[in-house]
């Protein structure tokens, strides 16, 4: 039945109130949805920034420790020229036999090879001053001995690397080693320093776009906010899983690097004392004929040669093995590192 005319204004008013209430409710729900989306977006951005700060800290710390190891290896190899200069003055010296004991084998002394690696290491050391953070660590990742030998190779331009100076020689060597554990390192060193060792140790692809959540999505506002908030959170969570995997890897690499550094530092300390003793015999005392050496002097000389071989082998170890799949993290060469440490300790226990 139609409403009486006098009731129509009241009915219209009631309908308006009801509609207004419904609209207000929808507005409240819409506002809450927007606030929730905004909160989600802010939380995702904040958490991602914390994750990236964690990654940068781990990467920088590991890079510095790898640099420390790489620099020590190059310094050791470069010091072989000093040994060679003194040792070559000794006349009538015998051919020292290859050390083979307790499962440990060391190479027979090769004067030419020692000189070559020493010169190459000197070339690389000369370029470290102008190189970015992570370059020396990249050499440790690939094996400093290999890098030093490559430093005497030929650059892609046809120029002998050893004829280049400073960072140019270092970069040419990095490029020469590009197919190995150092893939992407030269570009990384030029672009951002600390990322260089990460690219060498992790694989360049690992440090690519998948690690980062684009800043654009975090800046979305207005009507698209609610649609993008969940997407931003999902991207952050995906990046977080990858960052955590990388950070765990960096911690493991740092631990392996530091352990190797300790053993290398210990062996080098013994080598330096023996080298100083040999210099004293040959240079200060003027003993340059093996036939006039005392038994103690002969033992010291033989042990110094042995230490050169041990250090040469230790500096050959690649700390990182390049992954066959560029999207995978590289492998820490723990077996080779542990074997090298064990061999060094066995030789020290046997001879020193």
Regions found by a protein language model. Give the residues of each.
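Small-residue-rich hydrophobic membrane-insertion segments
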Residues: 1-29, 123-222
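Proline-rich intrinsically disordered, low-complexity coils
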Residues: 2-4, 9, 94, 107, ...
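Extended, low-complexity, charged alpha-helical tracts
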Residues: 29, 36, 40-43, 47-54, ...
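N-terminal amphipathic alpha-helical segments
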Residues: 16-45, 222-235, 239
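Glycine-centered secondary-structure boundary/capping sites
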Residues: 85-92, 178, 336, 340
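Membrane-inserting hydrophobic helices used for pore formation or membrane fusion
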Residues: 326-352
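Amphipathic, membrane-inserting segments
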Residues: 46-98, 198-199, 204-330
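Glycine-rich, hydrophobic membrane-spanning regions of integral membrane proteins that mediate transport
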Residues: 101-122, 134, 138
């Amino acid at each position: 039945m139609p409403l009486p005319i006098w009731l129509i204004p009241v009915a219209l008013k009631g309908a308006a109130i009801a509609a207004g209430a419904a609209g207000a409710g929808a507005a409240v729900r819409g506002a809450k949805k927007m606030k929730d989306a905004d909160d989600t977006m802010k939380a995702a951005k904040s958490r991602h920034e914390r994750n990236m700060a964690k990654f940068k800290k781990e990467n920088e710390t590991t890079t510095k420790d790898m640099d420390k190891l790489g620099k020590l290896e190059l310094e050791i190899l470069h010091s072989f020229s000093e040994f060679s200069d003194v040792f070559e003055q000794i006349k009538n010296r015998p051919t020292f036999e290859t050390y083979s004991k307790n499962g440990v084998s060391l190479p027979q002394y090769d004067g030419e090879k020692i000189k070559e690696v020493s010169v190459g290491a000197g070339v690389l050391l000369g370029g470290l001053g102008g190189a970015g953070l992570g370059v020396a660590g990249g050499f440790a990742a690939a094996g400093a001995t290999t890098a030093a030998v490559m430093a005497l190779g030929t650059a892609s331009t046809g120029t002998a690397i050893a004829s280049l100076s400073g960072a140019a020689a270092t970069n040419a060597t990095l490029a020469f080693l590009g197919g190995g554990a150092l893939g992407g390192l030269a570009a990384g060193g030029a672009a951002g320093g600390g990322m260089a060792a990460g690219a060498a140790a992790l694989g360049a692809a690992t440090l690519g776009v998948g690690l980062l959540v684009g800043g654009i999505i975090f800046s979305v506002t207005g009507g698209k906010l609610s649609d993008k908030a969940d997407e931003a959170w999902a991207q952050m969570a995906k990046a977080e899983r990858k960052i955590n995997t990388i950070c765990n890897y960096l911690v493991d690499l740092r631990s392996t690097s530091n352990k190797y550094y300790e053993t290398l530092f210990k062996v080098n300390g013994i080598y330096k004392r023996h080298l100083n003793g040999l210099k004293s015999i040959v240079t200060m005392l003027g003993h340059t004929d093996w036939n006039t050496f005392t038994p103690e002097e002969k033992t010291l000389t033989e042990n110094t040669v042995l230490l050169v071989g041990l250090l040469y082998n230790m500096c050959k170890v690649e700390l990182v093995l390049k992954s066959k799949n560029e999207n995978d993290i590289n492998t820490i060469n723990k077996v080779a590192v542990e074997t090298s440490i064990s061999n060094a300790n066995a030789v020290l226990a046997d001879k020193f």
